[in-house]
Amino acid sequence: GLAYDISDDQQDITRMGINPIMMSAGELESGNAGEPAKMCCLFINDLDAGAGRIGVCTGIFR
């Protein structure tokens, strides 16, 4: 299998002024069925591959 190192992404996110909090999906589950879910944010890695068309700089984010 492939190993993924998220440390570079965490550094980039921190530079943008965002404080990432890593957690497992199990931490979002409730022990009581029917209890409202907790709020979360989805981080999509490699977003520039699909949304990287910015003028003449296609796919380049630095």
Curated annotation (Swiss-Prot):
Protein function: Activation of RuBisCO (ribulose-1,5-bisphosphate carboxylase/oxygenase; EC 4.1.1.39) involves the ATP-dependent carboxylation of the epsilon-amino group of lysine leading to a carbamate structure.
Signal peptide segment: none
Annotated compartments: Plastid, Chloroplast stroma
Organism: Vitis sp.
GO MF annotation: an example: ATP binding
Descriptive protein name: Ribulose bisphosphate carboxylase/oxygenase activase, chloroplastic
Coiled-coil segments: none
Chief localization: plastid
Cellular-component GO terms for this entry: chloroplast stroma; thylakoid
Swiss-Prot/TrEMBL keywords: ATP-binding, Chloroplast, Nucleotide-binding, Plastid
Family recorded in the similarity comment: Belongs to the RuBisCO activase family.
